[in-house]
Amino acid sequence: MIQQALTRLLDRHDLARAEMSAVMDEIADGGATPAQVGAFLAALRLKGETVEEIAGAAEVMRARVDPIRVDRDVFVDTCGTGGDGRHTFNISTTAAFIVAGAGVTVAKHGNRAVSSRSGSADVLAALGVDVDAAKDVVERAIEEVGIGFLFAPRLHPAFKAVAGIRRELGVRTVFNLLGPLANPAGARYQVLGVYEPRWVPILGGVLAALGAAHAFVVHGEGLDEIAVTGMTHVCEVRAGECERYAMVPEDLGLRRHEEAEIAGGDADRNARILADVLAGQQGGPRDAALANAAAALVAAGAAADLREGVRLGAEAVDRGAASDKLARLVAVTRGGA
């Protein structure tokens, strides 16, 4: 199958959703050689991935995942694509604790760094979380604490062999887009940041096709986040429809910040910034985390609009609920109560 698909891609033809799924199944089953996989990924990238192709790939990723059980109808993910190269602190990870502190269950999917010096797994490990905890520990954390970390390499074993091919290629491929689309707990409510604005409507279309209940696909001022530095492009997905609009920090009741104010560093530095935000420190990092938490709270139905989401997030921080979620997640993953 992969050989026929490669020929079609080289002739600049799009693949149908079922064709893409068949190729992904072949890759997962070990039926394609490394050379074939590398050529396929490069040809797909050169042609340009479509909604149907990404959706077909994501369906296989979801079907092949080692699933995490969550006994909740509504829970959110704040996993983005990474790869924006802007080296901010871990905004979406910080936002996840604020969302949990506000009372919404979070199944945070993530990995180690893509282009930054600190991915979500890196910063959480620096904070004391066992990011490679066993499945039952992750499920217990989600149930008892209201937040758990779903470490991608542990939970997507079918595509482990592709990691080496991706490293050798050294360029972005469809796999850079698939992580946030394949939450191992099956989250249908999410905030998904993308590294380029062109992906906002495309991944919005993918989430709509895959049955997302309520999601925000965002790109703000070069960041795979909602920006407090300027304009954010949004595709809000509900009931199979994608509403596109743009917004600025003032629309959320937040002031504008310089990008230097939200700059990060290595995992230890980013851990300090995250902890400071959860401790109530004012400034750009707090506002950036609140903006992204607000979207997750709206997606989950906990807030009527983004301004209310910012207010609820701020209350969760200021009463200590967000920092308590971090402390309890560390304790549970380390074998405590």
UniProtKB/Swiss-Prot annotation:
Residues binding Mg(2+) 2: 224-225
Biological processes, Gene Ontology terms: L-tryptophan biosynthetic process
Alphabetical list of InterPro entries matching this protein: Anthranilate_Pribosyl_Tfrase, Glycosyl_Trfase_fam3, Glycosyl_Trfase_fam3_N_dom, Glycosyl_Trfase_fam3_N_dom_sf, Nuc_phospho_transferase
GO cellular component: cytosol
SUPFAM superfamilies: Nucleoside phosphorylase/phosphoribosyltransferase catalytic domain, Nucleoside phosphorylase/phosphoribosyltransferase N-terminal domain
Keyword Nucleotide-binding attached: no
EC number: 2.4.2.18
Cofactor note text: Binds 2 magnesium ions per monomer.
Source superkingdom: Bacteria
Binding site for anthranilate 1: 80, 111
Residues bound to 5-phospho-alpha-D-ribose 1-diphosphate: 80, 83-84, 88, 90-93, 108-116, 120
GO molecular function, a single term: magnesium ion binding
Annotated Mg(2+) 1 binding sites: 92, 225
Binding site for anthranilate 2: 166
Entry keyword annotation includes Chaperone: no
Enzyme class: transferase
Obligatory cofactor(s): Mg(2+)
One Pfam family this sequence matches: Glycos_trans_3N
Family named by the database record: Belongs to the anthranilate phosphoribosyltransferase family.
Function summary: Catalyzes the transfer of the phosphoribosyl group of 5-phosphorylribose-1-pyrophosphate (PRPP) to anthranilate to yield N-(5'-phosphoribosyl)-anthranilate (PRA).
Name of this protein: Anthranilate phosphoribosyltransferase
Gene that produces this protein: trpD
